[in-house]
């Protein structure tokens, strides 16, 4: 029985996970062109030319830095623009980690600091308003 329930729950989670659409991913940056070194005949990278503007950079990191500074927004569009920074937090005089829960009476709008104090206030002042005078007499008369 437990195995059956486990399988049902697993299938439920799998179906929910498949139903969640994934956001579109931005396009990948262009690949770093690999140019062989003509002097040593090795495959070591010597220079990289930008396919957008033709600028030649000496290394892959320099090419990627050039790409991000100059052409990223052209390729990625609005996805490349950074979101505006969050406003700085407003300083407060006092930071409370715990605020006590108060209980307000819906009949007289008196606020009691705790649940037992509210129940005591309710029984003393408003029980007759809700149930009428007969509520207390019936409670005493019943065995």
Swiss-Prot record:
The keyword Ribonucleoprotein is annotated on this UniProt entry: no
The protein's name in its UniProt record: Host transcription reprogramming factor 8
Keywords: Host nucleus, Metal-binding, Repeat, Secreted, Signal, Transcription, Transcription regulation, Virulence, Zinc, Zinc-finger
InterPro entries: Znf_C2H2_type (IPR013087)
Region described as Disordered: 24-43, 77-99
Biased composition (Pro residues): 24-34, 82-91
Expression triggers: Expressed during multiple stages of host plant infection, including the early biotrophy, late biotrophy and transition.
Biological function: Probable secreted effector that translocates into the nuclei of host cells to reprogram the expression of targeted genes by binding on effector binding elements in rice.
Upper lineage: Eukaryota, Fungi, Dikarya, Ascomycota, Pezizomycotina
Keyword Membrane: no
Zn finger residue spans: C2H2-type: 48-71, 103-126
GO CC annotation, single: host cell nucleus
Signal peptide: 1-19
Superkingdom of origin organism: Eukaryota
Species of origin: Pyricularia oryzae (strain 70-15 / ATCC MYA-4617 / FGSC 8958) (Rice blast fungus)
Molecular function terms from GO: zinc ion binding
Cell compartments where the protein resides: Secreted; Host nucleus
């Amino acid at each position: 029985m437990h195995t059956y329930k486990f399988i049902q729950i697993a299938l439920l989670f799998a179906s929910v996970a498949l139903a969640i659409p994934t956001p579109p991913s931005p396009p990948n940056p262009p690949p770093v062109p690999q140019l062989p070194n003509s002097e040593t005949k090795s495959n070591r990278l010597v220079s990289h030319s930008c396919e957008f503007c033709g600028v030649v950079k000496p290394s892959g990191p320099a090419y990627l830095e050039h790409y991000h500074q100059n052409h990223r927004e052209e390729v990625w569009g609005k996805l490349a623009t950074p979101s505006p920074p969050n406003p700085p937090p407003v300083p407060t005089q006092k930071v409370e980690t715990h605020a006590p829960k108060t209980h307000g009476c819906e009949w007289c709008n008196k606020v009691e600091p705790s649940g037992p104090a509210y129940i005591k206030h309710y029984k003393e002042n408003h029980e007759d308003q809700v149930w009428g005078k007969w509520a207390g007499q019936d409670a005493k008369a019943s065995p």
